[in-house]
Design a protein with these regions (language model features):
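Solvent-exposed loop/turn and edge beta-strand elements of beta-rich ligand-binding domains
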Residues: 1-234
């Protein structure tokens, strides 16, 4: 019922009546294929998975009349669902591990007897507020160097690991490594601070930074930092 659009005619005249009837398939299939919007962040990182995302398939653009649910597998594909040949509306109900929920509502035209595929992507969760290191004099606990010493030029080695670890089970090799140095910066009230952070202005050497939306970010994982070169006089 509902899978076919049916109709017919009855012809009457002299003698026997004739009937002509027809049935036209009125359903098609909908499916979804999902990817990461930033594979440089997610590839090889077990904190991210495109499996388990759920999407609702709706008859109306306000998404109040749900027809079916689609769930992604480890390759980002879903099974097909049969729906009436028409435009359906699809939105994400729950995001997979490590991703933000996509709040967009997508339309998909389904034709009778055919399979329509919606291609979508999710944005990985990242830390976009980067950590800042402030260098101070240990004895005075202030950001003023003593004598002819300097707090600028201290070098810190940052190591990022694509996974959640503690100090006892860190892998032997980091996924990416960076070396940065402290730079003197003066704030609005005239106070000078000696700062290092993961940005090109502070970078001495190392891998490229992870980028998203034009900014350096950190993917989900573990970060360690260690001072590997003291500034002059320390």
């Amino acid at each position: 019922k509902g899978r076919y659009e049916c109709g017919g005619y009855i012809y009457s005249g002299e003698g026997q009546e004739l009937g002509q009837f027809w049935a036209k398939l009125n359903v098609g299939n909908a499916k979804l294929q999902k990817t990461s919007s930033n594979t440089s962040i997610t590839d090889g990182n077990g904190n991210y998975s495109i499996a388990g995302a759920t999407y609702g398939v709706f008859a109306d653009k306000d998404c109040t009349k749900q027809l079916a649910t689609l769930t992604t597998d480890e390759n980002g594909n879903t099974d097909v669902v049969e729906v009436k040949a028409d435009t359906v509306y699809i939105k994400e109900l729950s995001a997979p591990a490590g991703y933000k929920v996509d709040t967009n509502i997508y339309s998909l035209k389904v034709e009778a007897g055919k399979t329509a595929t919606l291609n979508v992507s999710d944005t990985p969760k990242v830390t976009d507020t980067l950590i800042e290191l402030f260098k101070i004099d240990m004895e005075t606990q202030k950001d003023n160097p003593q004598g002819n010493a300097s707090l600028a030029g201290a070098e810190f080695t940052w190591k990022y690991y694509a996974g959640f670890y503690n100090k006892d089970n860190l892998p032997a090799e980091a996924t990416r490594t960076w070396v940065t140095k402290t730079i003197a910066e003066t704030d609005s009230d005239g106070t000078t601070h000696y700062i290092a952070k993961l940005a090109d202005a502070y970078k001495v050497s190392g891998d490229s930074f992870y980028m998203q939306d034009g900014k350096a970010v950190l993917p989900l994982g573990t970060l360690t930092v260690e001072e590997t070169k003291a500034p002059n006089g320390y």
